[in-house]
Every structure is written in C-alpha cells, then in structure tokens.
C-alpha cells in the first residue's frame, strides 16, 4: 500500500531565485538580514543586498567564464569553502547565470577533489583562503586553468572574490545579469541547478542532480506545513534565527542555510567551522529559535558541562542525517528544554521528506509525517508491499526526488524501480500510525538469520558513562561463513577507563541475545564520519573484514 501525507499542495510554478527574492511565499522583507557572521554580526547582508550581489555575480560567471552561455543546467561551478557570509550569494549567482552549483567537502584531499571536479565537469572553482592551495592542486590535476580558480573571502569584513592573491575583485563589479523566471513545470522539473554528492556511506559518492522543482518544493512545502499547523498558536510566531554550522557541500547545510531561512523569513549566523563551545555560546548570544542538526551535535550538547540557559529561546529542534536514539533524544531534550523531532531523508530526496507539525511530538523513533505531495511504500526483497507492522525497504515518489545521478545511468537505473519509485535502501516499519526507521538495508547485521540494528546497540552503548562515541558493524564469523557478529568500535570518554569485558557485560545485561558483541570491542581514537555527521560504516566494515572475526560465547 501507499502511505500518503495529510494533504497535498499545488506544485509551485516558480524557480528557486524567484522564490527567494520576489515571491510573497517567502517571509523576508527587503531589510531582513539573511546572513551574518556569528563572530561579528555587523558583517551581514540583507535580502536587498543579497539580490543585488546575486545579479552581479551572475554577470561575472556568465561574462568572464561563460557559465550558462550555452543554456541552463550545463556548466558546473564547484565551491570548496568553509562557511562564510557571501557563500549563499555565490550559490545564487551560479544559478542566476544558468549554471549548476556543486561543492566538495573541505575535508577532502586535493586528489579526491580532482576526482569530483572531473566527475562533475566543473569549469570554475570557488575556494575559501584556507582551501586555495588544495583547489589549485586539484585544478592542475584536471587541466583547469589557474585563472579559473577563484578565492572567496567574506568574513572579518573582508569582501573579496578574485584569482588567487591578485587581480580584479569581482565583488566590486556593478554590471548585473537578471535570472530567467521559469514557470513551466517541465523546465522546473528537468533543469539541474544543484549537483550534490551522496555521503558515500555505502560506496563511492555519486553526483545527485537537483532541480528547481526539487529545491523549491522541499523548502516551500516544509514551511507551509509549519505555517498551517501553528495557526491559533501566537506564541509560536517568533523570528527565525539559527546558527549556520553544517557543511554546505551537503544537502543539510545547502538547503538548511542557503534556502530555508530565506523562505522562513530569518537570519543565519555563520560559523566558519564547528566548535561545540562556540556553538553553545552563539545560540544564547543570538537567541536562537530554530535548530536543525545531526545526532553528533546533540551528543556534544549532552556531554557539555557548559549548558545552562543557552537554549531558553529555542522553540523548535530537529534531528536528521542519521537516526537519533531514544536515549540521546531524551537527554538532549532535557538539556534544551525543547522537544526534538526526527526528520528523515537523503540527498536524493533533496533532504528530508518528513516534518513534524507544530503541536505534535514523538519519542518512539518515528520519522515525522510525510511532506505534502510525497508518496511512500514499504516493500520486501521482491518489491511487494509488506503488511502493516512488518519491516520493509522504504520507496519514495514525489516532486522532491532526484531525476538521477549525473552521467551515471547504471546507478540511476539501479536506484529506481521500473515504475519510478526511488529505492532508499532504508528499512522502516509502519507502527501505531507512524513510520519508524529501523536502519540502512546495507548496514543491518545478519546474525543467524536475525537482523540486528547497529543504531540500537550504539544508542544503548552511549548511555555508558565511559563511552564518548561508538559505531557498530558486522564482523565475519570464522565458524559460519555468511554469518556476522556485532562488533563495537568505541571512543572512550576522556578521563574514563573502561574494558572490553565491561562493555560486553553491559550489553549482555540489557539487550537480547542476538545483539551481543560477539565480534568484540575495538577501542579507537575517532569514529570515521562524513562531514554531515554520518558514520562511515564501510570503513569500519573493511577493517573488521580484514581482521579475523572474534566470537565470544555469550
């Protein structure tokens, strides 16, 4: 069966820049400060200023570098930058020129960036000063001329976009290029404006093509649900203020900081890089009202001994990118003084396809109600719908789903059913009127025919006072080919002392027999994660498989 949202909306007939800068559906005024530097909020830009800078940068990208000259959706510009005030304007300027915004994580090496440059066919690179050398090295490997490597600096009241340390400052340009207004549904659905790379949790990253329709419907429908559900609740009519701390090379940061705040009518205070102590302080300094982040940040808040009243102005907290365990959710809600709702999605669905309406909450692991116009199914291995209460792979269809992977028809064909449903690879179950996420299909541990969720074991181990962080994967069983043994990779909390035997006993005393750590406990310094906070289990699985399985009779 299909699971439907509470209501549908008419598909928006407008392009992204029109939504951000001209449509009354966005709640910003001309004087609204859209983006400000957290360390110095006098360094900021208003909506009116952002529109002007967008048009000027669009002219620069078109006239100086030919972006969009042969039509929209063909020429990519790659950004490799820490968060900064004018990065959203660069994003909009690229789209305004008819180009495609793409981005590489600042954590990548020059060699990794060069692979992404080639795969995306990027023609220009925009880097922050700290990544200038990396961008040049990557460009050289790809044969991109050095004059097509631009450096953007917009923190500390510096406003520069130039070729390295010299040459013309393109931010001083005055000529403008207005963007093309698009109302045709076909063009909105099929014009790629954003090329973001999947997190690579289960394999090499792939370029996910996102259109005007994808980004506009995602941002707009989420806000419309919230607006509809807060009618009659005047205490919820608070200004939108948040701290920009997520990487913008990923959908959570790109959508959540470039687009959503402008539609919601508020301000992003930008941190160039995440630091938990500074983040907590900024949340108080700017009386933050909205927080959307990943479980590692909530984990940092819970572990901090500095939290007092820094989150007293918070009215809405959301978690995404990875499942939030019940234990961590309850601890974080107590610290924040605010309920946390889980949202669920992925790059291929333009971020989250669920959101929690005002006045509702959940602490059962539910992923929040489906967004308007989306459709969801739960299926078995043969793509047959499962019965209510049975686990199944989640399939999606709707305006937020990508058309596919850039220049990768094989991966695109594999990701979709023949009738157009996107196969998420996530396992869920419909229970008590809610969809509950169980785990990634490829990450479930198979122990003697039973499926074990790493997330459940991780959430429990994080309640141990000596555990700072943990990831669980399946290790090979040397005595039973094809069988997997749960193994925990553990980061010990500073100043604590904990043994493998102690953690095994902790799990044994509280979890079912098939969830025991028969694969052992390995202590490491850091859990490998993507820039968006997802555990890179494939790295740990490779480590586990390269070593002999260690079975303990429990």
Swiss-Prot record:
List of residues binding AMP: 195-206
Gene3D superfamilies noted in UniProt: 3.30.300.30, N-terminal domain of ligase-like (3.40.50.12780)
A single MF term (Gene Ontology): CoA-ligase activity
Superkingdom, taxonomy of origin: Eukaryota
EC primary class: ligase
EC number: 6.2.1.-
The keyword Cell division is assigned to this record: no
InterPro entries: AMP-bd_C (IPR025110), AMP-bd_C_sf (IPR045851), AMP-binding_CS (IPR020845), AMP-dep_synth/lig_dom (IPR000873), ANL_N_sf (IPR042099)
CDD domains: Firefly_Luc_like (cd05911)
Keywords: Ligase
Protein's name according to its UniProt entry: Putative acyl-coenzyme A synthetase
Native organism: Emericella nidulans (strain FGSC A4 / ATCC 38163 / CBS 112.46 / NRRL 194 / M139)
Top-level taxonomy: Eukaryota, Fungi, Dikarya, Ascomycota, Pezizomycotina
């Amino acid at each position: 069966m299909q699971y439907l949202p509470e209501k549908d909306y008419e598909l928006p007939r407008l392009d992204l820049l029109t939504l951000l800068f001209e449509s009354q559906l966005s709640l910003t005024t001309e004087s609204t400060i859209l983006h400000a530097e957290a360390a110095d909020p006098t360094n900021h830009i208003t909506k009116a200023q952002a529109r002007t800078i967008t048009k000027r940068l669009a002219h620069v990208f078109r006239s100086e570098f030919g972006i969009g000259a042969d039509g929209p959706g063909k020429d990519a510009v790659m950004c490799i930058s820490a968060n900064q005030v004018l990065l959203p304007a660069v994003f909009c300027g690229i789209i305004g020129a008819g180009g495609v915004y793409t981005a590489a994580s600042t954590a990548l090496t020059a060699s990794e960036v060069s692979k992404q440059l080639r795969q995306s066919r990027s023609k220009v690179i925009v880097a922050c000063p700290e990544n200038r050398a990396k961008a040049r090295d990557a460009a050289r490997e790809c044969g991109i001329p050095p004059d097509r490597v631009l450096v953007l600096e917009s923190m500390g009241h510096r406003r520069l976009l130039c070729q390295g340390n010299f040459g013309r400052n393109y931010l001083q340009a005055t000529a403008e290029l207005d963007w093309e207004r698009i109302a045709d549904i076909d063009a909105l659905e099929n014009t790629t404006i954003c090329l973001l790379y999947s997190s690579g949790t289960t394999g090499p990253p792939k370029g996910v093509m996102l259109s005007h329709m994808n980004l506009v419907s995602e941002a707009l429908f989420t806000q419309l649900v919230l607006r509809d559900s807060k009618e009659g609740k005047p205490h919820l009519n608070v200004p939108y203020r948040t701290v920009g701390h997520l990487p913008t090379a990923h959908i959570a940061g790109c959508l959540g900081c470039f687009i959503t705040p402008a539609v919601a009518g508020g301000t992003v205070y930008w941190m160039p890089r995440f630091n938990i102590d500074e983040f907590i302080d900024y949340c108080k300094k700017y009386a933050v009202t909205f927080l959307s982040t990943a479980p590692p940040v909530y984990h940092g808040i819970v572990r901090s001994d500095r939290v007092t009243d820094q989150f007293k102005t918070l009215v809405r907290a959301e978690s995404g990118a990875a499942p939030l365990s019940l234990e961590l959710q309850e601890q974080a809600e107590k610290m924040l003084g605010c309920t946390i709702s889980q949202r669920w999605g992925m790059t291929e669905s333009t971020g989250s396809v669920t959101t929690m309406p005002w006045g509702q909450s959940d602490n059962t692991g539910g992923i929040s109600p489906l967004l308007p116009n989306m459709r969801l199914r739960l299926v078995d291995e043969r793509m047959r719908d499962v019965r209510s209460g049975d686990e199944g792979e989640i399939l999606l269809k709707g305006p937020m789903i990508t058309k596919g992977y850039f220049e990768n028809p094989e991966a695109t064909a594999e990701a979709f059913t023949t009738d157009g449903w996107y196969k998420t690879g996530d396992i869920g179950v419909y229970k008590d009127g809610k969809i509950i996420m169980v785990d990634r299909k490829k990450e479930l541990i198979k122990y003697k025919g039973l499926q074990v969720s790493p997330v459940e074991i991780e959430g429990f181990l994080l309640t141990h006072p000596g555990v700072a962080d943990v990831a669980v994967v399946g290790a090979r069983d040397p005595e039973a080919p094809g069988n997997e043994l749960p193994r925990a990779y553990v980061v010990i909390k500073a100043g604590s002392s904990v043994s493998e035997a102690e953690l095994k006993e902790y799990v044994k005393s509280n979890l079912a027999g098939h969830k025991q750590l028969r694969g052992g406990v390995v202590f490491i310094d850091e859990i490998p994660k993507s820039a968006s906070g997802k555990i890179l289990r494939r790295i740990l699985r490779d480590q586990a498989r390269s070593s002999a399985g260690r079975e303990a009779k429990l």
